[in-house]
Amino acid sequence: MKLTLPRYDQAPVLVVGDVMLDRYWHGGTSRISPEAPVPVVRVEQIEDRPGGAANVALNIAALGAPALLVGVTGEDEAADSLTDSLAAAGVEAHFQRIEDQPTIVKLRVMSRHQQLLRMDFEEPFNTDAAAMAREVEALLAGVKVLVLSDYGKGALQNHQVLIQAARKKGIPVLADPKGKDFSIYRGASLITPNLHEFETIVGGCADEAELVSKGAKLMRELELGALLVTRGEHGMTLLRPEHAPLHLPARAREVFDVTGAGDTVISTLAASIAAGEELPNAVALANLAAGIVVGKLGTAAISAPELRRAVQREEGSERGVLSLDQLLIAIEDARAHGEKIVFTNGCFDILHAGHVTYLEQARAQGDRLIVAINDDASVSRLKGPGRPINAVDRRMAVLAGLGAVDWVVSFAEDTPERLLKQVQPDVLVKGGDYGIDQVVGADIVQAYGGEVRVLGLVENSSTTAIVEKIRNK
């Protein structure tokens, strides 16, 4: 399947479930307490992040989709912090605020990016289930997907009322389940247990065949539209009636913290389905999103640009021939990793040894090399009738195959000035024996603080000379 990122801005999603505040105390540790054999943490920073169902809504909003949230909090400072954080992120929150009961807070003590301790502050909520159902039913009219984010904390009292209300309106219901009784999710469009949660219900699975068999049985018993089992480092398995199982390998480049990964999966699924994606594509996007979020510390959201870059990597556009839009995203990703962007341009009609040497020298000026080449019409204008010898797609393919070249892009004008204004490379490189002031686009690059460098050409290497030699034979 070919992955693309859908338009999330017209894909409203309603999340209902257990909201909580993830609080982090960050500090340094340099000694052991004289009172007990425990480290002493000197707290230097306190950070609050939305957690649980609130993190699901936050992830949906971070992708650019309208996010609505229904949940239960106390009447306290933690609820105020949650409300403020969600409002700042564009989440429309509808909370039942209950006096004399605390908002759920999970406090983590961190030192040097390591979690030393977690403390949970929570009590069972006396939720007004009827009032919540009325609130949800009223909000369903303006959304395309309903998410039940269930942490078993008491916000969700009557799952079936909510599922049936959504089904009557033709709205898909996605549930992130919890507990030992999955029958409460009967009739959901999709549930997303992790492997441990799944095996708690169906028993241990010795291999994938047993997982598929038990999953199919569970779907039949609960009348589910689909089942997605998240399996950590083994990826995900999507099961659907009348379809072959879809196994997706894990995509994490580096696992730093799995906190909130399940929230990221269901939020990306929900936003993608709301945006019109077919389920296999939505699952593939969720798999990529999970691979990104486990590389972050703590409860975290991913943005649409981050997911778009992951899609590009998946589709092989991290290197090679790119469109301008793809190139700009790739550059953004490279700069986020502190890489220096080098730019050169030319016709590159017949690639020869001089070109290869020059491009290797250009690549050495930074971390990433962009080669911009004139399209066929502009080469003809510059070089005259009979040129180019090779069409632009062939010239680009040859350049993309060189180890020194990261990205190849074409332009239609006679000069790359428009492209330079959009790309804004750190270094503009040209080959020749002329001064910097004669380099086309030098003024553009220097105006924003970039560098311009002129590299010497390899002697006795000329495309024009090669063409003339061939024609004279």
Curated annotation (Swiss-Prot):
Pfam families the record matches: CTP_transf_like, PfkB
Record-annotated disulphide pairs: none
Protein keywords: ATP-binding, Carbohydrate metabolism, Kinase, Multifunctional enzyme, Nucleotide-binding, Nucleotidyltransferase, Transferase
Gene3D superfamilies listed in its UniProt record: 3.40.1190.20, HUPs
Residues that hold ATP according to the record: N194, L195, H196, E197
Region feature (Ribokinase): 1-318
Name of the protein: Bifunctional protein HldE
Function: Catalyzes the ADP transfer from ATP to D-glycero-beta-D-manno-heptose 1-phosphate, yielding ADP-D-glycero-beta-D-manno-heptose.
InterPro entries xref list: Bifunc_HldE, Carboh/pur_kinase_PfkB_CS, Cyt_trans-like, PfkB_dom, RfaE_dom_I, RfaE_dom_II, Ribokinase-like, Rossmann-like_a/b/a_fold
Pathway(s) served: Nucleotide-sugar biosynthesis; ADP-L-glycero-beta-D-manno-heptose biosynthesis; ADP-L-glycero-beta-D-manno-heptose from D-glycero-beta-D-manno-heptose 7-phosphate: step 1/4; Nucleotide-sugar biosynthesis; ADP-L-glycero-beta-D-manno-heptose biosynthesis; ADP-L-glycero-beta-D-manno-heptose from D-glycero-beta-D-manno-heptose 7-phosphate: step 3/4
Gene behind this protein: hldE
Segments of this protein annotated with the region Cytidylyltransferase: 343-473
Active site: D263
Single GO biological process annotation from the record: ADP-L-glycero-beta-D-manno-heptose biosynthetic process
Subunit structure: Homodimer.
UniProt xrefs under PROSITE patterns: PFKB_KINASES_1 (PS00583)
Entry similarity comment: In the N-terminal section; belongs to the carbohydrate kinase PfkB family. In the C-terminal section; belongs to the cytidylyltransferase family.
Catalyses which reaction(s): D-glycero-beta-D-manno-heptose 7-phosphate + ATP = D-glycero-beta-D-manno-heptose 1,7-bisphosphate + ADP + H(+); D-glycero-beta-D-manno-heptose 1-phosphate + ATP + H(+) = ADP-D-glycero-beta-D-manno-heptose + diphosphate
An example Gene Ontology molecular-function term: heptose-1-phosphate adenylyltransferase activity
EC code: 2.7.1.167, 2.7.7.70
Matches recorded under SUPFAM superfamilies: Nucleotidylyl transferase, Ribokinase-like
GO cellular component: cytosol
Domain of life per record: Bacteria
